[in-house]
Amino acid sequence: MILPNTTATTPFLNALWQGTAHQGGNTSGLARRSPGGDDSQLEALYILMVLGFFGFFTLGIMLSYIRSKKLEHSHDPFNVYIESDTWQEKDKAYLQARVLESYKACYVIENQLAVERPNAHLPEIKPLS
């Protein structure tokens, strides 16, 4: 396992401090230069925070609205009917009744002559061409 080298940053920080201390004798140069690089990071953080709060606020409103609608209409007869399985059973029974009704309404007319003489020649209509 490779351990991280934590002492490598110390010479870099010392050199940076020496360079800024010799420029003006005070640390105001460092204070003037650092905000330029950090502003863009802070701006991105600010935008992410605003979007996060907006998303959290919108999600909260949406969930509370859905919950209130669910509680408001929980005892509505239509919703109770939809949530129950009785409509599926009734629909299935209705479909079976319709199939039986249509089956009973269909009938076949039997041609007695065709049944008595199955090998007899039946006349065909020839198309005009």
Swiss-Prot record:
Subunit structure: Interacts with KCNB1. Interacts with KCNC2. Associates with KCNH2/HERG. Interacts with KCNQ1; targets the complex KCNQ1-KCNE1 to the membrane raft.
UniProt cross-references to PANTHER family, sorted A to Z: POTASSIUM VOLTAGE-GATED CHANNEL SUBFAMILY E MEMBER 1 (PTHR15282:SF10), POTASSIUM VOLTAGE-GATED CHANNEL SUBFAMILY E MEMBER 1, 3 (PTHR15282)
GO MF term set: delayed rectifier potassium channel activity; potassium channel regulator activity; transmembrane transporter binding
Family: Belongs to the potassium channel KCNE family.
Location in the cell: Cell membrane; Apical cell membrane; Membrane raft
Modified how: Phosphorylation inhibits the potassium current. N-glycosylation at Asn-26 occurs post-translationally, and requires prior cotranslational glycosylation at Asn-5.
Keyword set, alphabetical order: Cell membrane, Glycoprotein, Ion channel, Ion transport, Membrane, Phosphoprotein, Potassium, Potassium channel, Potassium transport, Transmembrane, Transmembrane helix, Transport, Voltage-gated channel
KW Manganese (keyword) present: no
Single GO BP term: regulation of ventricular cardiac muscle cell membrane repolarization
Major localisation: membrane
Modified residues (Phosphoserine): S102
Protein's recorded name: Potassium voltage-gated channel subfamily E member 1
Domain of life: Eukaryota
Ranges that cross the membrane: 44-66
UniProt KW Glycoprotein keyword: yes
GO cellular component, one term: apical plasma membrane
Intervals, Cytoplasmic compartment: 67-129
InterPro entries linked: K_chnl_KCNE, KCNE1
Classification via Pfam families: ISK_Channel
Role description: Ancillary protein that functions as a regulatory subunit of the voltage-gated potassium (Kv) channel complex composed of pore-forming and potassium-conducting alpha subunits and of regulatory beta subunits. KCNE1 beta subunit modulates the gating kinetics and enhances stability of the channel complex. Alters the gating of the delayed rectifier Kv channel containing KCNB1 alpha subunit. Associates with KCNQ1/KVLQT1 alpha subunit to form the slowly activating delayed rectifier cardiac potassium (IKs) channel responsible for ventricular muscle action potential repolarization.
Glycosylation sites: N5, N26
Membrane topology: Single-pass type I membrane protein
Gene field: KCNE1
